[in-house]
Amino acid sequence: DHAGIATQFRVEKKIYDEKKLHRGEYSREYFLEEAHKWVESKSGTILSQLRDMGSSLAWKDTYYTLDEKLSESVIAAFIKLFDEGLIYRSERLVNWDCALKTAISDAEVEYITLTKRTKLNVPNHKYPQYPFGVMAHFYYEICDKDGKKTGEKVEIATTRLETMLGDTAVAINPKDARYNHLHGMYVWHPIREVPIPIIQDEILVDMNFGTGVVKVTPGHDPNDYEVYKRHPEIGLISILTPDGAIAPGYGQFSGMMRFDARVEMVKWMKEHGLYKEEKDHEMRLGITQRGHDIVEQVITPQWFVNTTDMAARAIKAVDDGELKIVPDEFVVDWKKWHENIRPWCISRQLMWGLRIPAYRVQIDGKWAEGNGEWVAAASQEEAIAKGAKANNVVPSRVTVEQDPDVLDTWFSSALLPFSGVGWPSNEERLNRYFPNSILETGWDILTFWVSRMVMMSLTLTNKVPFHTILLHPLVRDAQGRKMSKSFGN
């Protein structure tokens, strides 16, 4: 397995340790050359260790997820899903690693619980540590749509003060009589110097919790993004650059790393009489596995798989007895996961991995629009032909540009039960070895890997990839931690 983000992190660290070069100081070609050398050395170790353990395996069938045959399978799957409308490009909230400057999967996020004010290290920032587990209380001043202030304030509480830069509304519960007089009113955003609306939202706001007034930051919070979908008139703003600095347009805070901006915003609000207090607050904080950075939620254009119908088929396979999960206590988790499934983000802003086989189309030097803007193809020549057909023009008017992003490792991993035995070209071998009888794996990747193998297999082959899923407990180290490349254990 080429192990995408984990491998890139290790190779970048190796390059820095040996050459003192950071990403951005060397070319993609140089990185890939170093990565292939590192992979070759580790592959030999992996195979020798398997032999030393007495593994009885079909050594002649060893494959690597970036070799030519596997890559062809992955590209074929992407094209088929794209052409069927199941893969699409959209701007949505994703987990973002500011240190690595890429979208990451839920599997690459580890959560810690803070019971009180706790100082943590954050990469690429000014100070050694920053406080978390703190609820900051500040004020917004009430105004009309023209920004004329009434003299009244509302109190807002947040654990992420810096995100107020991206607030596009504050919300109240329509049943909360305390705020009836604020219906149709606005609050003054003191840093952007604009009025933002007070909206009514019964789903977001519990009027019996806190002050009953909630900031709404659709560009950086999943719950607030849902508010935006219910109230699209409020709009959304992304306040961060890819490396986690405050974007231009936010006064003196622009250019600061996000948690440095938080520190300075507290001082600024105190000077302007807008900061009330801060209190210890229990919270759950997402940390990136690789760079140990604080995970951000950001809106970026990415590639997604529409998994809604796939998930329904995965549930049905278990209900019908076609797929058995052992121990059966995990059936509840299986159903809960698939009933609440979200679109799967499959693009990564990395150098290591299989480049996404999607091409953006230009007609006479101008970007195409609508359904003809992007095509999926196995080559540039095929992309030009598809782009011409999609836009009803002759190929000579078409140029294409391949997306620079790479596919999520989990995408290629999801195809392994059939891509590893010849799909889609070697039908004889596929019929001999697919579907498998049993998958034996750790319970911790039931949703990240097993679920996706089942969904991809049902969608692309119309068969379950195996008939039994046998889940084992986890082997842990002396400190109780699971085996992890990021822990080095």
Swiss-Prot record:
Biological processes per GO annotation: valyl-tRNA aminoacylation
UniProt keyword ATP-binding present: yes
Catalytically driven reaction(s): tRNA(Val) + L-valine + ATP = L-valyl-tRNA(Val) + AMP + diphosphate
Pfam families per UniProt: tRNA-synt_1
Keyword Protein transport assigned: no
Motif 'KMSKS' region, residue range(s) on this chain: 482-486
Gene Ontology CC terms, in alphabetical order: cytosol
GO molecular function: aminoacyl-tRNA deacylase activity; ATP binding; valine-tRNA ligase activity
Keywords of the record: Aminoacyl-tRNA synthetase, ATP-binding, Ligase, Nucleotide-binding, Protein biosynthesis
Binding site for ATP: K485
Family membership noted in the UniProt record: Belongs to the class-I aminoacyl-tRNA synthetase family.
Name of the molecule in the record: Valine--tRNA ligase
Gene: VALS
